[in-house]
Amino acid sequence: MGSSNLNINSKITDIFAYQVFDSRGVPTVACVVKLASGHVGEAMVPSGASTGEKEAIELRDNDPKNYFGKGVNEAVDNVNKVIAPKLIGLNAFDQLTVDQAMIKLDNTPNKAKLGANAILSVSLAVSKAAAKAQNSSLFQYISNKLIGLNTTNFVLPVPMLNVINGGAHADNYIDFQEFMIMPLGAKKMHEALKMASETFHALQNLLKKRGLNTNKGDEGGFAPNLKLAEDALDIMVEAIKLAGYKPWDDIAIAIDVAASEFYDEDKKLYVFKKGIKANILNAKDWSLTSKEMIAYLEKLTKKYPIISIEDGLSENDWEGMNQLTKTIGSHIQIVGDDTYCTNAELAKKGVAQNTTNSILIKLNQIGSISETIQTIEVAKKANWSQVISHRSGETEDTTIADLAVAAQTGQIKTGSMSRSERIAKYNRLLYIEIELGDKGKYLGWNTFTNIKPKNFNI
């Protein structure tokens, strides 16, 4: 992964980290890496609100007098005082050696000593500096040098745009965390984002007409005080039509249930805030068993133009996820996020057990770009789809847009058509589309190679 031939100009000469803020106004880590050539790489790391138990550790100061314990001075110090002295002099083109040096320095299974936020900030900044030193776009550098694809033809990702927020990302009654639109009928990246923008604004107008608030959640989607998943799905379908598009054919729906957030481990039940409709599955006490949850999700896919379900069951309910995949996975994308936490070993376990047919990829869940690529490669080998993802606490860093193109994942999940930290990724993709010209393809429905979507009429 990366060249080990040391060019004097590719030597790392300086590494400097400092504290900045994410999109929620919470501290996070930024890093600057300088090379002997004079090239500079800069990176900022994101932070999640709904986090998996098996994620690499995001190091916080836990000092209640500073940012209510959310400061990252310790992580910053770890970069400046521990990591930097060990990495200065290394070859920036040898990403694997750089990342492994930090992992060895940390010497914990989950990066608890130095912090995944510290390690990732350096990992990303090194890759950016190296790309500049090679006079290459970041996506081309990652693809050719880190992944080894050696291609000039790329796939532009279908976006999953979060238009209604619930769960841990919004202060409303909706239990499911994200309701997203996927412009699968588009032929080009810019056309897909046009469709998404028009649908987003059509939805805003519908919400206003119904007296529902149009405040935004963490990821830029609306957070109306709806009670049920069905309420959100109904108004989304209406918005797609109002924007002049056909539900399913032009724009399909993806949902992130984030079921771990409302799963009661002791009772082994999925407990809804206000409950789903009483007549659904004869649910009692507004809670569902794993089997009932699967039946509920299946029912939703028959009623609404849903193509993708993420974290439909708890991250520890592997048997349930397996059953969900068996039930609807032939034609619906079943994405594992908290289940795998971008961990290659967990992904291998999922492949062996047929737990899902897709994986969500988040850089900060594992904590380095080389480990992220390793997890993507596990999924590709299994013919699973991969979805590159942002976090709810984002920054203006656009690395994930380049990563999605570089790894040819075909899908990206990076928020709504509002909030500049989300739009930055879409704008980067628009530039990449122009840069690639006819060497960049937007696959639309053809992005799904391991499922056979059924025709859906609504």
UniProtKB/Swiss-Prot annotation:
It is an enzyme of class 4 (lyase). Its cofactor is Mg(2+). Mg(2+) binds at residues 256, 310, 337. Gene3D superfamilies: Enolase-like C-terminal domain, Enolase-like, N-terminal domain. GO terms for molecular function: magnesium ion binding; phosphopyruvate hydratase activity. (2R)-2-phosphoglycerate binds at residues 177, 362, 391-392, 413. Its EC number is 4.2.1.11. The active site is at 219 (proton donor), 362 (proton acceptor). SMART domains: Enolase_C, Enolase_N. Binds a second Mg(2+) ion via substrate during catalysis. CDD domains: enolase (cd03313). SUPFAM superfamilies: Enolase C-terminal domain-like (SSF51604), Enolase N-terminal domain-like (SSF54826). It is found in: Cytoplasm; Secreted; Cell surface. It comes from the Bacteria. NCBIfam families: eno. Belongs to the enolase family. This is Enolase. It comes from Mycoplasma genitalium (strain ATCC 33530 / DSM 19775 / NCTC 10195 / G37).
